[in-house]
Amino acid sequence: MNTLQRTQSNAKRQHADPGAWINVIAGNQEQPAWNVAAIMVKIRTSYELLKSGHASDADFDRVGAALNIGLIRAESIDPLCEQTMLRGIDAMYVCAGLHERHGTYGFTGPGIVAMNDAVDLYEEILTKSNGRQMTIAQEAAHVRLLKLINGVVQ
């Protein structure tokens, strides 16, 4: 090995991330309770605002994103979990329809029951999933949403 090759080889080694193992371990641990609580406070607050008819579009988007991410995780967990999330998403479609017709968000009676179950399930999924799993689910939900927007059918 000549001097130039040695110099290039050393340069490659210096660019490696010496703390990469920390990221791998942290990404494969369950969510800390404080993180789950912080996320769920925002989601539950937005959900309550949707129920009361005082929600903004951002509140609707927050709850919808949580359910879509939860659906991705639920698909890999259990068909019953998947059906629970799908019923919650259907309730969100009805909620959006009410907003288009009346100008305020809201749910029907069965929609409230479905949403209560879906939000509770999302909290359980968030608690039991590690950060890496939730990041993968978030990316998959984003890709699925882009396909839906662009009219690509799965």
For the regions a protein language model found, what residue spans apply to each?
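Amphipathic alpha-helical binding modules
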Residues: 104-154
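Helix-centric, low-specificity signal for extended rod-like, repetitive segments
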Residues: 5-7, 35-37, 137
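Extended intrinsically disordered, low-complexity coil regions enriched in Ser, Thr, Gly, Ala
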Residues: 62-94, 124-145
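Short, flexible domain-boundary/linker segments around small modular repeats
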Residues: 18-54, 80-106, 144-150
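Secondary-structure edge/capping motif, primarily at the C-terminal ends of alpha-helices
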Residues: 47-53, 70-77, 99, 122-129, ...
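Arg/Lys-rich, low-complexity, intrinsically disordered N-terminal tails that contact nucleic acids
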Residues: 1-22
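Extracellular/lumenal glycan-associated surfaces
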Residues: 54-75, 108-124
